[in-house]
Amino acid sequence: DNTVTATEDTPFVFTDADFGFADVDVTTQPEDTFGTVTTLVSTGKLELNGVEVTLGQNISHDDILAGLLTFTPLKDGNGVGYDSFQFTVNDGIADSLVPSTLTIDVTAVNDLPTATDNTVTATEDTALVFVLADFGFTDVETDQLQSITVTTLNSTGTLLLDGSAVTIGQTISQSDISAGALTFTPLANDNGAGYDSFAYTVNDGVADSLTSATMTIDVTAVNDLPTSSDNTVTATEDTPFVFTDADFGFADVD
């Protein structure tokens, strides 16, 4: 029996040293039939020259030396004792009596997180405070969002971190977002769907996402109070004066 170690998401190429072989008559493996697969893998793919190996298939020593026998774990699969198969060896005359087991451990590698687009809704004339849930984040290892990096800036309102303007390429930590330090404020009396946006990548503590996502900001309108202004009108002695609406100073941004 033997154990080999593969790497997550990477084909493992077997060598003859991976297969336990001993023969009192010879010191090296022969150049003809080397072994027979007696039980198959159950999780990944065992392939010979790109074709899945079948139960009872003979595999030559030359094929192994040529690097044609490979094992590929399932996407994102890893773990100790991840998979195994059994085999007999052949000295050119006869097979071994008892099959041996080749166990395959798969070492985990960090998978890049994924950033996803999102839309948040702010209120006119009010600062929007971002929370972690606003930033689309997925990770196959179920790691948590550790930071974002701003890759393109907004164009209309103001994006601030602790009161200072955010710059392109700036990394903003999970703790800053959780503390409510990242805010967006629309221009005064401004509103609308798709009012502004910025792009960002996400980080799982090891690596950034490969592509950016877009944070779109809608701004809901609120009624602005009207304003009155002083005015003077001129009446005529002994004559009733009739007011019109134009006589009353009135302004409303809405």
What are these regions (language model features)?
Residues 1, 111-118, 224-230:
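Proline-enriched interdomain boundary motifs that mark the N-terminal boundary
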Residues 1-8, 227, 251-254:
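Short intrinsically disordered, low-complexity coil segments enriched in acidic
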Residues 11-13, 17-31, 41-109, 121-129, ...:
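Acidic, turn/loop-rich segments in luminal/extracellular domains of secretory-pathway
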Residues 37:
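Short helix- or helix-capping micro-motifs
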